[in-house]
UniProtKB/Swiss-Prot annotation:
Family named by the database record: Belongs to the adaptor complexes medium subunit family.
Gene designation per UniProt: AP3M2
Keyword Glycoprotein: no
Subcellular location: Golgi apparatus; Cytoplasmic vesicle membrane
Protein name: AP-3 complex subunit mu-2
Chief location of this protein within or outside the cell: Golgi
Keywords for this protein: Cytoplasmic vesicle, Golgi apparatus, Membrane, Protein transport, Transport
CDD domains per UniProt: AP-3_Mu3B_Cterm, AP3_Mu_N
GO CC entries: AP-3 adaptor complex; AP-type membrane coat adaptor complex; axon cytoplasm; clathrin adaptor complex; cytoplasmic vesicle; cytoplasmic vesicle membrane; early endosome; GABA-ergic synapse
Native source species: Homo sapiens (Human)
Physiological role: Part of the AP-3 complex, an adaptor-related complex which is not clathrin-associated. The complex is associated with the Golgi region as well as more peripheral structures. It facilitates the budding of vesicles from the Golgi membrane and may be directly involved in trafficking to lysosomes. In concert with the BLOC-1 complex, AP-3 is required to target cargos into vesicles assembled at cell bodies for delivery into neurites and nerve terminals.
């Protein structure tokens, strides 16, 4: 199925390649580079690119393109999901998935890829199993391997492969038994110039860190599970139980894993946590324009909005900007025309604002449309959809584990039109 995998950085350099069947020439990536040049942003490169003799399927994560080469027609989502699994595995092994880290651990990377695919078909994609096959790198293990010439490949068959629960190894033991869950929601929204919501959607995930002895059986229930649409589960979740009772019942993998991802559509009246007041004016036959924006909390349930960053691509006719922020720092690049304002936390009693004038090109006509304002922010201990975990129960073991739930909302593509 998958013949080759190429890892390409944002500069267009191929820094790693892996072939499972026959060697595919790097020249096949020329079709990908052409599509990359046509795309305005890296995220806009088509995920499927047909060529005369191959198909190129790609994902873009952590400023790296993971490009799979196939020669026969296969379901594209199948390959794309596998590529995402490769990225998640690298992140689990090395802590971060970046070009320098992959280069530093290139031997382990090749060993992991060799186990994940067998003759081009996915074989072992569970992190628990892979870590028994290929030991994660440590400083001590790296030094020993360098001296002795050994590898990270394990010398025993993974116990999980022989179990009815392939995602969990047997014989797990911990001194402190704990289960923590993070509910992370990302809100994508477009707000028109009057402040009305054009569209708003929430993409959410529940990430888990489970370190429990033995073979625990967990159930996780929600206060309002009907909010969730398009739910995608980890294989450990019993789907029939979810369909009938809207309860998550599962034997968890050991360690960190993504329990589920979900989507909340605009039909459920997505709450907008921030608002932007703006007054941006360009005058005809004038060399000055007015710029004024204020950011404030809207529906945050009393929680603090942190890490606020405002960016805006100004029109070509703007030569410079003389602005004064009431809070934070700002920069304007006269070459790229990009305005950036690092706000930080929002104090509801003293709303941050950015005011000043714009120097415009002499004789330039008024822009066809005002610039769009892009926001980034995060809110701790809040799931903006209103999703709440009701309780977590454990069966099959007699000890009492430590349990914890954290919530976080952050901005995805959050745009305000002016």
């Amino acid at each position: 199925m998958i013949h080759s995998l190429f890892l390409i950085n944002s500069s267009g350099d191929i820094f790693l390649e892996k072939h499972w069947k026959s060697v595919v020439s790097r020249s096949v990536c020329d079709y990908f580079f052409e599509a990359q040049e046509r795309a305005t942003e890296a995220e806009n490169v088509p995920p499927v690119i047909p060529t005369p003799h191959h198909y190129l399927l790609s994902v873009y994560r952590h400023k790296i393109f993971f490009v799979a080469v196939i020669q026969t027609e296969v379901p594209p989502l199948f390959v794309i999901e596998f590529l995402h699994r490769v990225v998640d595995t690298f992140q689990d092994y090395f802590g971060v998935c970046s070009e320098p880290v992959i280069k530093d651990n290139v031997v382990v990377v090749y060993e992991v890829l060799e186990e994940m695919l067998d003759n081009g078909f996915p074989l072992a994609t569970e992190s628990n199993i892979l870590k028994e096959l290929i030991k994660p790198p440590t400083i001590l293990r790296t030094v020993v391997n360098t001296i002795t010439g050994s590898t990270n490949v394990g010398d025993q068959l993974p116990t999980g492969q022989l179990s009815v629960v392939p995602w969990r190894r047997t014989g797990v033991k911990y001194t402190n038994n704990e289960a923590y869950f993070d509910v992370i929601e990302e809100i994508d929204a477009i707000i028109d110039k009057s402040g009305s919501t054009i569209t708003a959607e929430i993409q959410g995930v529940i990430d888990a860190c489970v370190k429990l002895t033995g073979m625990p059986d967990l159930t996780l229930s929600f206060m309002n599970p009907r909010l969730l649409d398009d739910v995608s589960f980890h294989p450990c979740v019993r789907f029939k139980r979810w369909e009938s009772e809207r309860i998550l019942s599962f034997i968890p993998p050991d360690g960190n894993f993504r329990l589920l991802s979900y989507h909340v559509s605009a039909q459920n009246l997505v709450a907008i946590p921030v608002y932007v007041k703006h007054n941006i004016s360009f005058r005809d036959s004038s060399s000055l324009g007015r710029f004024e924006i204020t950011v404030g909390p809207k529906q945050t349930m009393g929680k603090t909005i942190e890490g606020v960053t405002v960016t805006s691509q100004m029109p070509k006719g703007v030569l410079n900007m003389s602005l004064t922020p009431s809070q934070g720092t700002h920069t304007f690049d006269p070459v790229t025309k990009m305005l950036s304002w690092d706000v930080g936390k929002i104090n509801p009693q003293k709303l941050p604002s950015l005011k000043g004038t714009m120097s415009l090109q002499a004789g330039a006509s008024k822009p066809d449309e005002n610039p769009t304002i892009n926001l980034q922010f995060k809110i701790q201990q809040l799931a903006i959809s209103g999703l709440k975990v009701n309780r977590l129960d454990m069966y099959g073991e007699k000890y009492k584990p430590f349990k914890g739930i954290k919530y976080m909302t952050k901005a995805g593509k959050f745009q305000v039109r002016t």
